[in-house]
Amino acid sequence: MVSRPCGDIYHYDFIVDNGRDLWRVQVKTGSYMMEGLYQLCVRRRTGGVQVPYTKSEVDFVVAYIFPDDTWYVLPVRELAQRETVSFCPKGSSRQDHFGYFREAWHLLQGPDGLVFG
């Protein structure tokens, strides 16, 4: 089940209930490319300052790369306080640091095997 919090006071966009866990999920969309890699900001603004997401605020950042029609399901612990992450385009021969998380909906899987995505 996916729920949306009421108001804009939380650092996440959705709660995903997989029957065992409640995951706080922040959704980001990107299409900006620099030096052959898609660049995506994974930070929030507070008091006029941009800061990275932390484990106390969100559990996953789900990134949609629009030109490739590709989703990445990123555990926030994998972001290691980064404010920006880079993704290789589909078909690229470059090593993609976050390639394991491409379409990794299984990370949100519940005990009944239900997978979101």
Region roles according to the model:
Residues 1-10, 15-117:
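Mixed-charge (Asp/Glu-Lys/Arg
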